[in-house]
Amino acid sequence: MKKDDYGIIGGSELLISYGRHTPWNNINILRSYEDAMSQTKTGNHWSSTENSSNNAWNVNFNSGNTNNNNKNNNNVVRPAVAHDSEWTALRETIQTAYIDCCKGKSSSRQCLDYIPHADEDLDVLTDELMNGTYTPDTSTCFLVKYPKLREVFAAAFRDRVIHHWIILRLEPLFEQICHKQGNVTHNCRKGFGTKTAVLSVQKGIKKVTNNYRCNATIFKGDLVGFFMSIPQRRMCDKLKEFINAQYHGDYKEMLLWLVEIVVMHRPEKNCMFNSNPEDWVGLQANKSLFRCEEGRGMPIGNLTTQQFANFYMAEFDGYVLQCLQAHKHQMRRQKKRFRWSYSRFVDDFIIVCNDKEFLMNLVNKCDEKLLEMGLSLHKHKRYIQPANHGVMFVGTYIHNGRNYLSNRTIGRFEERVHGFIKYLNEHEKEITITELEHIRDTINSYLGFCKGRQTYRFRKRIVGQFILQCQKYFFRSAHYNKIKLRRKFRPIFK
């Protein structure tokens, strides 16, 4: 089904978006009854001809009266379109993906802008999927400066719905891989995160060192420009091979087609900039899609990028685990005990074992495997030390059964708190409840990260400073774990 000369899918039988503006598709919007009449030869978009007494009714919602052929009424009733069961079933899955996409984003500007037109655009999106005409829309590119300079691409909201549609079908299969590998990866998974990653490394060190009584060696590796180095074609082929072998649900061909489109899409060739172009000067070449090698790179910011990258690294996880298990069996035949532990978070991974010579050889094998995958280890970010020296991982320094915040995290926390104090003092008469809630949520987020780490004295100092300066608005919990907004001030700011 193709668009006709007037931008209407399927010709005059389907009048889409009549009386509304839908900025997320390429349809030429018909803004009035007269426009609709002038752009067709028959003028028969309704149940009958224009002057027929059986014509479609326009409802005056202000008075409740119904006025036949009221051309000046803005509350236009769109004609109902009959769809087959296949279209309806697909539309329901798109609706499910849309609801999943809106979770946690209902207050964002993109979501609020999309909601009034969601039903119409999701209908159009369903048509595009049925007809095989879907293409990604324009993305928004911007730079995040905090905590470090990073390039981010925000996909159009309708494209995010497609991303969720894909992941809803593939995520359970990705989880099966993670479970089979022993849950060694902790990013982009429900129930996992930085906390479980730190606990995994801590338990691994404790196991390998026999409760800190034996010697062991730690290797920490980091990949160079991970997201911008991923070869698109290799990843796409791996995903399609995996789907063909493991996916047995509905819309398999459509899923394969969408994976090809999403993975091979180059958003930097069709994007809007929301940051000063001069800021890109300070961004490393291997951190930007605009300067990475052709056929490489995935946009940071998309749900599919995170999930697909995690799936891609599962191949590396499997290789490392296979090498460790093989050496364990070899040592067992020699009646020697070999202990090991492996954990990964995105592109950072840690291997702990009690055989230093084997670990050095394994690092070289990891280099070769990553080169085969189109990736590479960072030469200047290789950490090999005795386990009793501790290791820094995902913002936490893990040392002999204790966890400490990294200096960088402490510095960022102090910087934010002092910035909030200054802002509250300078805008005392202008501050709103929304801004106060944002300040509360940000500080509590940092305090939440402090849990499980030896941070009591630090929390007492930094929270004490904040409450001392801002006690008019906030108060703290007993153990400096949380700050709360004083309720008696809320009506004033509303």
Task: Identify the residue ranges that each predicted region occupies.
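C-terminal, surface-exposed recognition/capping segments
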Residues: 2-85
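Non-catalytic, polymerase-adjacent accessory regions of viral genome-replication enzymes
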Residues: 85-123, 486-494
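Short, conserved non-catalytic motifs in the polymerase core
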Residues: 104-108, 112, 137-161, 178-192, ...
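Amphipathic alpha-helical blocks
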Residues: 114-138
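Right-hand nucleic-acid polymerase module
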Residues: 155-156, 164, 287-289, 293-294, ...
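Active-site-proximal segment of RNA-dependent polymerases
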Residues: 171-231
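Conserved polymerase palm-domain catalytic core
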Residues: 210-346, 350-365
